[in-house]
Regions:
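Proline-centered loop/turn at the N-terminus of a beta-strand
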Residues: 107, 190, 265-267, 283, ...
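A glycine-centered loop/beta-turn motif at secondary-structure junctions
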Residues: 339-376
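Active-site-proximal beta-strand elements of phosphoester/diester hydrolases
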Residues: 190-195, 309-310, 348-352
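Cysteine-nucleophile active-site neighborhood
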Residues: 234-308, 359-374
Length: 376
């Protein structure tokens, strides 16, 4: 392992050990409280531009496999772990985490106090940082960081969205029925999925809910979708998760506004949830350190039940959006809005991730609610 040198924008300078790729990399540091699922987290496109600090101390124990990828590659800038475990053991593993990171040119940082980093981010907020296995000089690292764009100024959607449309026909993973993905059931409705960085298991859950899926690029044309809806080629539109600040996505906001005006049935998750808010005229704001993990309690306002959810976002919709929508879900950690049903059109959205991956499946019913909305 090589030494790695870290400089954070609050002036903190740290030294640790590296695994994975050797590089000099700039990104935003966040922390994730999930106990499992490091592969799914690193391959989630929503983490583009970020270093993920894992609060679980032992990482790497179960290796990596091709089946648990949430996209075609790893998207996070890097990962902090208290202790990287080189010796992995799992019957599904195909390579080590170190090999995986090298293959995807991602930096891993170990032998560092992740509790210290987590408390720093909690108290001071998510911040920009630079890590390098090539440069140790604090002044030079500071200069690199100061000359790099902030995460709020980068449109990561252009990097993670598909370039061409495609059909998705895989269901969810059947662990008890042969360790394989289910074949798609006969669809009862069809949708277009706008890919802002969609996770594979979101698509799997939609398909499992008997919805036919065509994934389309982020530079979609609203008029085309409206025509397809009127011709009954699609029954609704899904707006996916994705990385970065939703306020920079001006073109996408304009197209979504046209879909809203046309009363197209829509469902949004995470970034899609935020874009629906902005397209209705209610701008999002940045949380201090975001919600990242698989243990976030959310109250279903209709049933009164509490669901433990998976979350991954740094931005949130404003409270005054209740002027045009009803709150369906609320976060019990900080009382932020987690779900909305709009008054003006057949549209609803959630901030958390009902597909989990990793995380609990207590919110999976939301995909069935989408089917009920779009069937005609």
């Amino acid at each position: 392992m090589k030494n790695v040198y870290i400089y954070l924008e609050n002036g903190t300078y740290l030294e640790a050990k590296s695994f994975g790729a050797n590089s000099t990399t700039v990104g935003e540091i966040v922390f994730n409280t999930s106990l499992t699922g490091y592969q799914e987290i690193m391959s989630d496109p929503s983490y583009a531009g970020q270093f993920v600090t894992f609060t679980t101390p032992e990482i790497g124990n179960v290796g990596v496999n091709d089946e648990d990828m949430e996209s075609t590659k790893a998207h996070a800038k890097g990962m902090f772990v208290r202790k990287y475990q080189k010796r992995y053991s799992n019957f599904r593993a195909e390579e080590s985490l170190d090999q995986f990171l090298v293959k995807h040119n991602i930096m891993g940082i170990t032998d560092i106090d992740t509790r210290y980093l987590t408390k720093m981010v909690r108290n001071e907020g998510a911040m920009m940082m630079v890590a390098s296995t090539e440069i140790s000089d604090k002044t030079e690292l500071k200069k690199i960081l100061e000359n790099s764009p902030r995460i709020e100024d980068v449109n990561y959607i252009e990097e993670v969205s598909t370039k061409t449309s495609y059909k998705h026909s895989s269901g969810t993973y059947a662990q008890k029925e042969g360790f394989k993905y289910n074949e798609a059931p006969t669809p009862e409705a069809n949708i277009a999925v706008v890919d802002f960085g969609v996770k594979r298991n979101i698509l799997n859950e939609i398909v499992e809910s008997k919805i036919g899926v065509e994934v389309i690029p982020n530079d979609f044309n609203a008029e085309d979708l409206i025509t397809q809806y009127n011709d009954k080629k699609i029954d609704g539109v899904f707006l996916s998760n994705g990385p970065g600040d939703p306020l920079v996505l001006k073109r996408e906001q304009e197209q979504i506004k046209k879909l809203i005006d046309a009363k197209i049935p829509m469902f949004g998750i995470c970034l899609g949830h935020q874009l629906l808010s902005i397209s209705h005229g209610y701008d999002t704001y940045k949380l201090k350190f975001g919600h990242h993990g698989g243990n976030h309690p959310v109250k279903n306002e209709k049933t009164g039940l509490v669901e433990i959810t998976a979350q991954n976002h740094n931005y949130n919709v404003p409270d005054n959006i209740t002027e045009i929508a009803s709150v369906t879900h609320s976060n019990l950690f900080d009382n932020t809005i987690e779900g909305l049903k709009y008054n003006d059109a057949p549209i609803f959205s959630v901030q958390h991730h009902p597909e989990s991956s990793p995380g609990p499946k207590e919110s999976r019913y939301i995909f069935n609610e989408f089917l009920s909305l779009i069937k005609r």
